[in-house]
Amino acid sequence: CSGYSTGQTMYQVQKEYQEVLSQYSNVMIGKLPKPHSGSGTGASYRFGDGNAVLTMACLVINTAEYCSETVPQLGDMVREKIDDAFAEHVNFDAVEDCYYDAINVAVRVLSTGLEARLMTHLNSMAKMPWESWSDVGDQSPYVASIHQVCVDVIPQLRRLLSETYFRSFCDSFITTFLALCV
């Protein structure tokens, strides 16, 4: 039966795990689009008319959520197995924070991406010479186009995200969107 070191060697191995797990969160963030400046709410992300980036952001959120839940368990297992002299130095909190950072970036990609899709229609609507209109119809084409963007995006997000992160997306979107409208 082979044995393994529960001292310095195991401590070094867990440090390597921490480094690799932190790098993995950066790889996930790297799968997301880079921010564009110029939004009234700070950096914005665009996911265009296709849904590939939207889907990737949801996958990043789901993967980072899983990792953020399992990393503390890994830390607990290492602390159980490692020598007492090293146990108090085993801390995976920074790694867990990396995954929460990835989630936050992905949620921001989703909320500002939807905002960017809507802004095209809102900007067109704002440029209309409304004072020249004599009467108002039942529903403007702007309302229909804004509704269609929401119908195309929001149900897909609801299907792909857990309730917690769908709510986080909604909160983030409303915060940035209302700041533009008010």
Regions found by a protein language model. Give the residues of each.
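Extended alpha-helical rod/solenoid/coiled-coil scaffold segments used as assembly/tethering elements
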Residues: 1-182
